[in-house]
């Protein structure tokens, strides 16, 4: 009988040890799992950051996957030229080329009959001619006065390549493509011995109520704000400046009780577009009190401080900021490497794994 108890005890001890080991493994896996929440107003570059994670950490886009973006790229291109043509009338700008009026009529006719995402050689020629009209170019220069995709010039300047027979989108074409994010999109990848779960949440106002489900157990928030949006208004409310909306949103997230212990990283994105714009449009259009030099560095630092000054718990909570260009893979790779080091330092120093 004694040996029976002994073997039962051994079995019990073995099971107990196995359970302990499993609990330890689960704890280690959980400690190595990083839940990243990407937040920010609409069109701030969140989805482009997600695409970069696929390029940098998940073997990029296959030819087949790139081909799936072709219709989106053509749709973005058509929407851009239609938006500029519409703004010509609103802003009272005339065409210079005599043929452009006829091209405009044909453009509208074809846009109404073609399937979304189609691009015929005839349509491509019409778009090319219109884009070459000095009146259209003058209207494009005033893009902040109406809603236009950031990718407009990228695609319209490269129509010959985009509409050539056998065209296969490259990664830059994919990165510049725009589809409004609705709901929550999760991307998983591994980096520096950590398992990342990145959640991209729709930025337009109507999408924000869905964020609440993502709050629990978030390791780090990356907040994207478009530097170049300082002279632009919201798609969903043309009375509201995009930069002001972004600051308002950042304020509510940065000081939210849910995120008291969450690392927050600020991506001041679209620095390339900001650099172009700041040479032409003074920052005082957004911040009337700003009287400093209208340079990339001075104006950029001023915007950065507008965000950082919203942090009400500076002594307890540091907000890390980076100027980014989400379409620049090397820039995102460098910045995300730094973000990962912050996560390791802030969140894993107490678990004894590093």
UniProtKB/Swiss-Prot annotation:
Compositional bias ranges of the Basic and acidic residues kind: 8-26
UniProt PTM: Potential N-myristoylation may anchor alpha-subunit to the inner surface of plasma membrane.
Disordered: region residues: 1-26
Compartments reported by the entry: Cytoplasm
Residues where lipid is bound covalently (N-myristoyl glycine): 2
Domain of life: Eukaryota
Tissue expression from the record: Expressed in taste buds (sensory organs of clustered epithelial cells) of the circumvallate and fungiform papillae of the tongue as well as in palatal taste buds at protein level. Expressed in enteroendocrine cells of the gut, such as in subsets of enteroendocrine cells in the midjejunum and brush cells. Detected also in spermatozoa.
Keywords: Cytoplasm, GTP-binding, Lipoprotein, Magnesium, Metal-binding, Myristate, Nucleotide-binding, Transducer
Binding positions (GTP): 40-47, 175-181, 200-204, 269-272, 326
PROSITE patterns found in the cross-reference section: G_ALPHA
An annotated GO cellular component: protein-containing complex
GO MF terms, alphabetically ordered: G-protein beta/gamma-subunit complex binding; GTP binding; GTPase activity; metal ion binding
Region (G1 motif): 35-48
SUPFAM superfamilies reported in the protein's UniProt record: P-loop containing nucleoside triphosphate hydrolases (SSF52540), Transducin (alpha subunit), insertion domain (SSF47895)
Annotated spans, G5 motif: 324-329
Listed GO biological process terms: adenylate cyclase-modulating G protein-coupled receptor signaling pathway; G protein-coupled receptor signaling pathway; response to nicotine; sensory perception of bitter taste; sensory perception of sweet taste; sensory perception of taste; sensory perception of umami taste
Residue ranges annotated for the G-alpha domain, each copy included: 32-354
Family: Belongs to the G-alpha family. G(i/o/t/z) subfamily.
Name listed for the protein in its UniProt record: Guanine nucleotide-binding protein G(t) subunit alpha-3
Species in which this protein is naturally found: Mus musculus (Mouse)
């Amino acid at each position: 009988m004694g040996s029976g108890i002994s073997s039962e005890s051994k079995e019990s001890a073995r099971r107990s040890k196995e359970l302990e080991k499993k609990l330890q493994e689960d704890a280690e896996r959980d400690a190595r799992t990083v839940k990243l929440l990407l937040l920010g107003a609409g069109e701030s570059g969140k989805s482009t950051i997600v695409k970069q994670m696929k390029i940098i950490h998940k073997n990029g886009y296959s030819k087949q996957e790139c081909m799936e973006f072709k219709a989106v790229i053509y749709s973005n291109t058509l929407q851009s030229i239609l938006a500029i043509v519409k703004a010509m009338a609103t802003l009272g700008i005339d065409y210079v080329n005599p043929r452009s009026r006829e091209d405009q009529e044909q453009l509208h006719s074809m846009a109404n009959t073609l399937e979304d995402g189609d691009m015929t050689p005839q349509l491509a020629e019409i778009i090319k001619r219109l884009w070459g009209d000095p009146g259209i170019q003058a209207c494009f220069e005033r893009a902040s006065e109406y809603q236009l995709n950031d990718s407009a010039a990228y695609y319209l300047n490269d129509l010959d390549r985009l509409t050539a027979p056998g065209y296969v989108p490259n990664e830059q074409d994919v990165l510049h493509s725009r589809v409004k994010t609705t709901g929550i999109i999760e991307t998983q990848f591994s980096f520096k011995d950590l398992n990342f779960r990145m959640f991209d949440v729709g930025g337009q106002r109507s999408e924000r109520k869905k964020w609440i489900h993502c709050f629990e157990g978030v390791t780090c928030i990356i907040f994207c704000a478009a530097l170049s949006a300082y002279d632009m208004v919201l798609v969903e409310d043309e009375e509201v400046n995009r930069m002001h909306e972004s600051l308002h949103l950042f304020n509510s997230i940065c000081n939210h009780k849910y995120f008291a212990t969450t690392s927050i990283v600020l991506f001041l994105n679209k620095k390339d577009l900001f650099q172009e714009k700041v040479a032409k449009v003074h920052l005082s259009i957004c911040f009337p009190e700003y009287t400093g030099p209208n340079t990339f560095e001075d104006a950029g630092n001023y915007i950065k401080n507008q965000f950082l000054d919203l942090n009400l718990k500076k002594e307890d909570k540091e907000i890390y900021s980076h100027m980014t260009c989400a379409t620049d893979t090397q820039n995102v790779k460098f910045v995300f490497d730094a973000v990962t080091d912050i996560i390791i330092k802030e969140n894993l120093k107490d678990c004894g794994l590093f």
